[in-house]
A protein has these predicted regions:
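Conserved, structured core segments of small domains
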Residues: 1-95
Length: 95
């Protein structure tokens, strides 16, 4: 059986606290626009919230670590202080 290993990069956000839904509202439109632009051009593979309401974080999967870091540094969720911590972790998928 042949196995294909693909290296991707997970950008993981830890949100600040339980009122994140209210606090993110003014920044959500730009955040979603940034996500959609990168999904459309292939730089971003998938993205979504982690946890139930309210979410406790986010997960964005990129093909390039540099793209993940650049996204986080420009993301209004990060620059406005909604994200307590973020990191980019290598993720090896097997298919």
């Amino acid at each position: 059986m042949e196995v294909t290993v693909t290296r991707l990069y997970a950008l993981i956000y830890d949100y600040v606290d339980d009122d994140v839904l209210e606090r993110r509202a003014p920044h959500r439109e730009l955040h979603i626009r940034m996500v959609r632009e990168r999904l459309a051009d292939g730089r971003l593979i998938m993205a979504g919230a982690l946890g139930d309401d309210p979410p406790h974080g986010g997960l964005l999967v990129f093909a390039d670590a540099g793209e993940a870091e650049e996204f986080a540094e420009a993301d209004p969720y990060v620059t406005s202080g909604l994200v307590r911590a973020w990191r980019v972790d290598p993720w090896q998928t097997v298919s």
